[in-house]
């Protein structure tokens, strides 16, 4: 049943109907549409449109429909209804007859869908926050177990300075904490109810919109009806949150793909998150991580697409805004799936400490320590930098690490170098010296783990 047929003398072309209908994706708003309708029925009692008995009948029928939807949401897709609003209204009329036709009094699909989508977004944000914190917790637990796993840190994908696997884990905890904060900020801004704003100019019934917002669990009602039915900032914000969050997960995946490679060999991924080759029997491919990395692009695309859709729209509602849902649903589903999969990857990961240690001892990752040693001896840093560069060239020529060069060879580059240089060049010394807040020293890493555990209530 179309909700707008009286104005028309011809039926819609079937091709247009298929093009126009949105039930195939907005069926996901069924529960929110029913919950919003229950609240609206209560508001109609306050302005005399419904009696208390009529409202009770409507609410009982809507609650029965809600249970039916929860038991079998796929039933909705068997309908020929235009959208989820017309499906719910049609089912309600089937249950209570003509009384069901009174429910839409004073309400437009414009404020109705805006309300439904905000309710869905609120619920989904809570799911994302839970999954985000679960992944943070998994990273903290992995860090706790690998505080002594020394490995090379990289810049330009070249070995730079020694770090620990724990410090690497904690870097992603920080990224995820920012993702969490962004979601919480987004939730604050979307937590206002547009219901009661009508098509664009407000409802003609003196409904207490603040009370109505409270019934639906919103903190308040929106302030301007024209903005309320046009607003999709929360869609853009959530897509932006997802895009940034997926960039973090993609970088996480890329790091672990490299760490798992034969060239690095720092970690071994569980059989539960890898697959084999149909031709090469020796292969163990990091498919879970590659899919996380690959899915990042579709989320970025959803954000870009929605921004382009909205940029040229005049106020208030336009049918273009129907395009807000498919990209949003897919992007947030994808982000949620990837958060869960990243946690599963960590659940079975094995860090190969000896290989990590060997790699950290190669590539002259202690060169900065020698420069700092010279600075402590009174050599200006820029000069010390040049001296160490020459020493590295000599070490490469001899095929030795810096700490294996004889003192006499080191003193060719600076007479201030003494026997006390060798303890400074050890990996442990490199770590211990990074003791400022946020550094890689064992004390700082342990403190960061404690702080994260306290914040996450682990």
UniProtKB/Swiss-Prot annotation:
One of its GO terms (cellular component) is cytosol. Its EC number is 4.3.2.1. One of its GO terms (biological process) is arginine biosynthetic process via ornithine. Keywords: Amino-acid biosynthesis, Arginine biosynthesis, Cytoplasm, Lyase. GO terms for molecular function: argininosuccinate lyase activity. It is an enzyme of class 4 (lyase). The keyword Isomerase does not apply. It holds the Pfam family Lyase_1. The keyword Amino-acid biosynthesis applies. It catalyses: 2-(N(omega)-L-arginino)succinate = fumarate + L-arginine. PROSITE patterns: FUMARATE_LYASES. InterPro entries: Arg_succ_lyase_C (IPR029419), Argininosuccinate_lyase (IPR009049), Fumarase/histidase_N (IPR024083), Fumarate_lyase_CS (IPR020557), Fumarate_lyase_fam (IPR000362), Fumarate_lyase_N (IPR022761), L-Aspartase-like (IPR008948). It is found in: Cytoplasm. Pathway: Amino-acid biosynthesis; L-arginine biosynthesis; L-arginine from L-ornithine and carbamoyl phosphate: step 3/3. Belongs to the lyase 1 family. Argininosuccinate lyase subfamily. This is Argininosuccinate lyase. The lineage of its organism: Bacteria, Pseudomonadati, Pseudomonadota, Gammaproteobacteria, Enterobacterales.
